[in-house]
């Protein structure tokens, strides 16, 4: 069972990597957890960077927005810390038999605090990176390595938006296809939390239902989109 599961993970990883390695796009954003790195938005002395690339100076209004975000972020971290500590104490009492199941269930169902809203100057358009053969596009600017080349033309911006929409649809299709293949092998056990659980009867029933549904509804295949030709790589 363990060997089969490992082989399956390797196959899925290879399939996903083989399909999107040439036309990959990466989303990044503000890191509320406070872990270091150069991904997403970073502000130093009111200078805005996205994925380590300098964008511009923050305006006065954006500086006020940043100050509010910092305040909200610090409060959020404290709320998460308190919430996790509350759960830890509840589980400890339950383990010692000092707390009933209803209280423990209420703690488990209690949602964690919501993170603060990202500042308006750190949008997906600012931080999304599109990797093509030979170059990268971020914030409608073309880079070769870390060297800025030029801005996209209005027509190229439209091409990029079309590519983004098609690639998003393709990645969803690919993920759905892989999930169906996993479900056909493990049924409900494709969920990693339930993979080794004793749910044979339910898995068999689910697999049967999926097979019936698959016989009546067939999803049209989605092809990988042709990438825009913003640069030419010579091999």
Curated annotation (Swiss-Prot):
Protein name: Immunodominant antigen Ov33-3
Species this protein is from: Onchocerca volvulus
Transmembrane helix found in the keyword field: no
Span of the signal peptide: 1-17
GO cellular component: extracellular region
Major location category of this protein: secreted
Keyword Disulfide bond: yes
MF annotations from Gene Ontology: aspartic-type endopeptidase inhibitor activity
Family annotation (InterPro entries): Pepsin-I3, Pepsin-I3_sf, Protease_Inhibitor_I33
Lineage: Eukaryota, Metazoa, Ecdysozoa, Nematoda, Chromadorea
SUPFAM superfamilies with a match to the protein in the record: Pepsin inhibitor-3
Compartment(s) where it occurs, according to its Swiss-Prot or TrEMBL record: Secreted
Known tissue expression: Reproductive organs and muscle.
Intrachain S-S bonds: 135-231
Function according to Swiss-Prot or TrEMBL: Aspartyl protease inhibitor.
Keywords tagged on the record: Aspartic protease inhibitor, Disulfide bond, Protease inhibitor, Secreted, Signal
């Amino acid at each position: 069972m363990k060997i089969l599961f490992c082989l399956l993970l390797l196959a899925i990883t290879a399939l996903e990597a083989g399909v999107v390695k040439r036309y990959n796009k990466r989303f990044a954003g503000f890191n509320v957890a406070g872990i270091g790195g150069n991904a997403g938005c970073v502000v130093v002395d009111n200078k805005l960077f996205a994925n380590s690339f300098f964008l511009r100076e923050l305006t006065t209004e954006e500086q006020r927005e940043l100050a509010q975000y910092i305040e909200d972020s610090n409060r959020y971290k404290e709320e998460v810390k308190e919430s996790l500590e509350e759960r830890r104490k509840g589980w400890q009492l339950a383990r010692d038999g000092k707390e009933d199941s209803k209280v423990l269930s209420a703690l488990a169902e209690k949602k964690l605090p919501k993170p603060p809203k990202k500042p308006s100057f750190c949008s997906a358009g600012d931080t999304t990176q599109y990797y093509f053969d030979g170059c990268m596009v971020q914030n409608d600017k073309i880079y070769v390595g870390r060297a800025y080349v030029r801005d996209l033309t209005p027509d190229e911006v439209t091409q990029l938006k079309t590519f983004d929409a098609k690639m998003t649809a393709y990645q969803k299709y690919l993920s759905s296809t892989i999930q169906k293949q996993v479900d056909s092998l493990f049924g409900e056990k494709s969920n990693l939390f339930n993979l080794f659980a004793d749910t044979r009867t339910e898995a068999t029933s689910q697999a049967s239902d999926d097979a019936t549904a698959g016989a009546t509804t067939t999803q049209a295949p989605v092809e990988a989109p042709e990438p825009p030709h913003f640069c030419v790589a010579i091999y």
